[in-house]
């Protein structure tokens, strides 16, 4: 796997869990001898939902809810087979979405 790059995108609603997962991935990759770039914080996606609190009229009585999606990017340059194997066996929390591109 010479001159290749693994790009890992992490998404989560809780930034603390996301940072812990990114740190685990970076430590695992560095221990196996690969060069790591990141974690790079990407822009946070914010979704706002507005609903009416009243049942019939009263348009002034509204409530807003927001959902923030935090993202991180990690690049692993020149991964060894040992690196790929270690990343496959890594246990991460269930609240983190992982997208891997080779």
Swiss-Prot record:
GO terms for molecular function: structural constituent of ribosome; tRNA binding. Disulfide bonds: none annotated. GO terms for cellular component: ribonucleoprotein complex; ribosome. Pfam families: Ribosomal_S10. InterPro entries: Ribosomal_uS10, Ribosomal_uS10_CS, Ribosomal_uS10_dom, Ribosomal_uS10_dom_sf. Transmembrane segments: none annotated. Keywords: Ribonucleoprotein, Ribosomal protein. The keyword Repeat does not apply. It comes from the Bacteria. One of its GO terms (biological process) is translation. PANTHER family: 30S RIBOSOMAL PROTEIN S10 FAMILY MEMBER. Belongs to the universal ribosomal protein uS10 family. Part of the 30S ribosomal subunit. Involved in the binding of tRNA to the ribosomes. This is Small ribosomal subunit protein uS10. It comes from Exiguobacterium sp. (strain ATCC BAA-1283 / AT1b).
């Amino acid at each position: 796997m010479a001159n290749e790059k693994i790009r890992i995108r992490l998404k989560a609603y809780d930034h603390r869990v996301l940072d812990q997962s990114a740190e685990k991935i970076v430590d695992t990759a560095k221990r196996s001898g690969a060069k790591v770039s990141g974690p790079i914080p990407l822009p946070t996606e914010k979704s706002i939902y507005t609903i009416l609190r009243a049942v019939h009229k009263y348009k002034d009585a509204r409530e807003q809810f927001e959902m923030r999606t935090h993202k991180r990017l990690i690049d692993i340059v020149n991964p060894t087979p040992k690196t790929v194997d270690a990343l496959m066996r890594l246990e991460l929390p269930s609240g983190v979405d992982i997208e891997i591109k080779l």
